[in-house]
Amino acid sequence: MKITKIETHVLLVPDYDSAACSSAQDDIIVIVHTDEGLTGIGEVDTNPWVAEAMIHARGTHNLGLGLEEMLVGENPLNVEAIWEKLYIGSIMTGRRGLGICAIGAIDMALWDLRGKILGLPCWQMMGGARKTHVTAYASLLPVGSTPEEFTTSLCTKIKEAKRLGFRAAKIEAGVKGPYSHNGLQASDELVVDLTAACREAVGPDFALMVDVIYSWNNAKEALRTIHRLEPYDVYFVETPLQVDDHEGYAYLHDHSPIRIATGELQNTRFEFLDLLDRAKVDVVQPDIGRVGGLTEARRICDMAADRGRLVVPHCWKTGIGIAASAHLSFANAHCPYIEFLPALLSESGLRRDLVSEELQFVNGQIPLPHKPGLGIELNEEALERFRADRVVAALTR
């Protein structure tokens, strides 16, 4: 069996809002085709137009070969060898950033394809299951543009998440800084108030995470507010500092009473080596597409295990990425949770409609799946409906 082509789809919701802090509004779907008719599906959370260009761009020299050109003719079972070929062949144009994101979507699709060829679920190809269920936490984005609207929205959503069976949730408390929701610039007091209100809404027997979305410029400023969150039994505080502030994260590791989590934007195991050893992060959050796919995510899990750290995969996309996160977690005992954007609580039509058959979700957990590959199916109607060229054309009429 050989790879024959890479099919890509850039998708966009018609009601996208460029002021919103939600990358669930767009997507790139990658489908790897073979000469025997089997296909594999992947996605990645990045700018979909640029990722598509990276995949289909022609190579002009041996430091910058085209990804699709390198793939055609390869045996899809050789997933790890293909990853190395793509990484080395695109070293000048790839290596980090969008190049790795494009490789990540391809690699995810190759794991799905290999599972379909062998008749095995991805977790089984990763060495077997370390647990019978994966616990998903509901990732909750507030609606509104004022502190009052944020509080009402998050409290309503977290109560509904608990009603739907979730045993854990993360509130998106980005109320200041460069990536705040809808441009809000509130005080640190609101982060504390949101956390207190959500804890009161769900009660004590419920894991609560808080994402402040890179709100602070220095660790001591961040620590003052983190200390104030301690009474609310917060499982972790996510991304308090900018991505590359390794010294600041190390300071928080040494002084914070709450676990610190980050890693959603990092690429490859090499950047996670810095997070683990220099930044001393307690919980690393590889986004499977962005790190380079399941092949690279497995290596990151091994690195974290060697250092006694936790892995909680980031995912703010569709049922495709959620499935990849779940399979990774099944194969690794030190993955206590995966991020889960609940379709019923999401404003994104892509999240609600793109995957017609997702992994089963029961009482806040995903039971061990047994279908080959990722175990999901695309909704072809939604794939057509959310085509970015059609959406943009309709908006510009």
Where are these regions (language model features)?
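Structured beta-strand/loop patches that form or line metal/cofactor-binding pockets in enzymes
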Residues: 1-41, 45-52, 345-352
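Conserved, mostly hydrophobic/aromatic
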Residues: 3, 37, 67, 106, ...
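Metal- or metallocofactor-binding catalytic centers and their adjacent structured scaffolds
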Residues: 33-117
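Hydrophobic faces of well-ordered beta-strands that scaffold small-molecule active sites
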Residues: 42, 136-138, 167-171, 208-212, ...
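Glycine-rich, aromatic-flanked loop segments that form ligand/cofactor-binding clefts
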Residues: 107-147
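Metal-dependent enolase-superfamily TIM-barrel catalytic cores that perform enediolate-based chemistry
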Residues: 133-250, 255
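Shared catalytic-loop signature of beta/alpha-barrel
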Residues: 227, 233, 244-365, 369-372
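Extended hydrophobic packing segments that form well-structured cores
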Residues: 372-397
